[in-house]
């Protein structure tokens, strides 16, 4: 049978582990998987674009497990009281093709995105970084803030969003963390002045130039998260030209990332090579580094495996007959049309 993790179960799982420990453990798992980069069968995500958003499938596999994520991006959804990003994913056994996990990934995507940002910053930011600007205070902002506060030593966050209510929500959600100071800014320029790290996590599908070259200061690390599809950017092109730029999966980032603005031969560095020690990350304390983060399927593979391990360990989730299993005659599919006496087979793990 297939493990099934719905939103309430994922919520319970994250609460049981703790948001910050979840992100920290996941960042370590991501680092391990990025270090075995060449073991994976990789491809860019398959995207279906419309005027109002995008729907994507993100596949990846190694020799034992295949994973994919279904995810959307619809920036105007909040006006209809809907989420901008929603996702679910599957982890399957390569030997048999059977799905071993069907899971919600909306909550988990925010966690894995924060964990990926953390993993990159641990490798690229200056070790004495203590102050971060957080531009875009929507659904993913708290996860990014906690990742950098709990695991990188960020003590002060200067927050800015075009919607003041989003910033108020961020501050309210994180008020219990006494070691973290969150201050409002009235503009992007005010938010980024004097910080060590800039995290941009905005949602508008537009060629935006939220961060401009005049805002850069020596030694900054930029964690550019929001630009993740064609026609959607956050950084002025000259910001990239004045920085050392790191990417997840270059063929995908060339299409969807900040570097879509630049020629195809603009030099970038594979993050996995830095993590493996094959190439340099930050080359000096004064260098500006950019993590051009678009989100890659390997990160979803990692979070699906982590969720399955943690759910099994805690006896959480349900098991469902998503496909016919071993007790059925594999040559008699027609028997499944007889209704099985109307019984729906869903079994709570614990």
Curated annotation (Swiss-Prot):
Gene3D superfamilies assigned: ornithine cyclodeaminase, domain 1
Pathway: Amino-acid biosynthesis; L-proline biosynthesis; L-proline from L-ornithine: step 1/1
Keywords: Amino-acid biosynthesis, Lyase, NAD, Nucleotide-binding
Catalytic activity: L-ornithine = L-proline + NH4(+)
GO molecular function: nucleotide binding; ornithine cyclodeaminase activity
Sequence positions that bind L-ornithine: 45, 69, 112, 228, 294
Active site: 228 (proton donor/acceptor)
Enzyme Commission number: 4.3.1.12
Cofactor: NAD(+)
Co-factor binding details: Binds 1 NAD(+) pers subunit.
GO terms classed as biological process: L-proline biosynthetic process
UniProt-listed Pfam families: OCD_Mu_crystall
Binding site for NAD(+): 84, 112, 139-140, 161, 202, 225-228, 232, 293, 331
Alphabetical list of SUPFAM superfamilies matching this protein: NAD(P)-binding Rossmann-fold domains (SSF51735)
Usage in biotechnology: Can be used for biotechnological production of L-proline when heterologously overexpressed in C.glutamicum.
Family affiliation: Belongs to the ornithine cyclodeaminase/mu-crystallin family.
NCBIfam families xrefs: PRK07589.1
Function of the molecule: Catalyzes the conversion of L-ornithine into L-proline with release of ammonia. Is likely involved in the L-ornithine degradation pathway that allows P.putida to utilize this compound as sole carbon and nitrogen source.
Subunit-level organization: Homodimer.
Protein name per Swiss-Prot or TrEMBL: Ornithine cyclodeaminase
Species annotation: Pseudomonas putida (strain ATCC 47054 / DSM 6125 / CFBP 8728 / NCIMB 11950 / KT2440)
Lineage of the species this protein comes from: Bacteria, Pseudomonadati, Pseudomonadota, Gammaproteobacteria, Pseudomonadales
